[in-house]
């Protein structure tokens, strides 16, 4: 009986070891010598540098963090943007190691059964931008029947009516099919406000346009939604590595206190069974900084976008990005 039990236990252990060492994606990454990431272009999150063409942004830094975790070098990455049907095929066949997507993008590409919707790396929102001299300080103060510019065919066609219907307030839609035309119309005040993703509005605010118009983004979001670090359903071990890497960056912002562990140790995750070497979390934070560091240099005060952290701050600072912690 004991022998039979021992054989069962050894069999289970062998299965566990086999699973831990299988690591299809990790093996592929280590063989290739780089982590391959992708996402849709968004200012501050993922966009090619105007001078070098190299992709930069918060998503790129998350990719660098994963490379630091599994390869020991944050620069061993490749990043490309998604735009067309060929890119959809790449998603479906798992050609990329980490893909940054919203729920809408997952649904539109019919990827729900093919990817693991991993941790949120950024909470995006739909927002309104008005001239700096406008009287409105809040969205609810937008004048009745005010014209609002937005891109036709975008999710704003749903979020704008839903938001203003909830306020029981009339507004005038001014849709456009080209970004440049919309910006020009706003700059000459053919519409009183412009609606868009928060990151896109921050980039438009920088441009000012032909009339050098200064603008303000109103604080209330029309809609909020996360951008997720997604991975293939075929390799749960890789999904776990990516998730714990993101959580390490978020946990590293936690301040230490009398009863609290701070920094990356707020959620120690050795992950030896997944092939991660000791000290991997410290290497990640050393390579790219904490989540707050990554946010500030790409979207916050140290960037041209100058966005407040808002929901992308830690819960202690009024935000919504949280990681597992040791209570």
Residue ranges: model-predicted function:
Residues 267-327:
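C-terminal functional modules
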Residues 60-70, 132-136, 141, 145-155, ...:
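Extended ligand-binding regions for polar small-molecule ligands
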Residues 4-14:
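Bacterial N-terminal signal peptides
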Residues 38-44, 80-86, 95-108, 132, ...:
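Beta->alpha turn/N-cap motifs
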Residues 34-44, 52-70, 124-177, 181:
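Bilobed "Venus flytrap"/periplasmic-binding protein-like clamshell domains
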Residues 51, 95, 108-124, 167, ...:
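Ligand-binding "clamshell"
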Residues 69-74, 78-100, 112-116, 162, ...:
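Short helices/loops that flank or line small-molecule/ion binding pockets
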